Amino acid sequence: MGQKVHPNGIRLGIVKPWNATWFASSQEFADNLDGDFKVRQYLTKELKKASLSRIVIERPAKSIRVTIHTARPGVVIGKKGEDVEKLRAGVAKIAGVPAQINIAEVRKPELDAHLVADSIASQLERRVMFRRAMKRAVQNAMRLGAQGIKVQVGGRLGGAEIARSEWYREGRVPLHTLRADIDYATASAHTQYGVIGVKVWIFKGEVLGGMPAANAVEPKADKPKKQRRSRK
């Protein structure tokens, strides 16, 4: 059987940034790593209904800075910033250093693999037909400018006795092209018949020289050659 490498992991440092950017000595590295894991766990639990996309952690000079990427920033902030202040105190307690929380809004949630996978999983838990949920996600992504999308679900689909997997794809999803900006995420739907896994790949275009291929200068086309008249 063919094995597939993780689409995000293989592109780190090429077209994908890291979710944690800090340096530490060998004595502090394990503690920082454990702290990052616990902070992510805490924020994911607290922000279940906030359409959380990703959490970026930085550690400048004995402090921690957390950037929360979400499609619903109002839910994270709360009334007069009460909720975000509560989160800041919780993160500072877990990390053991002063914390700062920034919130970044995801403008197009239909093009974010994490949000699409979570949306499909929540629909499956509400007993929406899996084919309808998949096709709706694919159509929304293509409508908003994705160059390609693939969605796969696996498990006891429709309550079947035997588990199987089905997928639906539209456009291009070039997994072997390292300069391709591919967003990948997974989610789990806990249904009455068991767990259904959801995988989403979204191709947003190629990155050439640090900028999207759509903005790159196209090479000039050669002038058409004049045809010689045949001698009679």
Curated annotation (Swiss-Prot):
Superkingdom, taxonomy of origin: Bacteria
Gene: rpsC
Keywords: Ribonucleoprotein, Ribosomal protein, RNA-binding, rRNA-binding
Subunit organization: Part of the 30S ribosomal subunit. Forms a tight complex with proteins S10 and S14.
Biological process annotations from GO: translation
Physiological role: Binds the lower part of the 30S subunit head. Binds mRNA in the 70S ribosome, positioning it for translation.
Domain KH type-2: 39-107
Name the UniProt record assigns to this protein: Small ribosomal subunit protein uS3
GO molecular function: mRNA binding; rRNA binding; structural constituent of ribosome
Family per record: Belongs to the universal ribosomal protein uS3 family.
A single cellular component GO annotation: cytosolic small ribosomal subunit
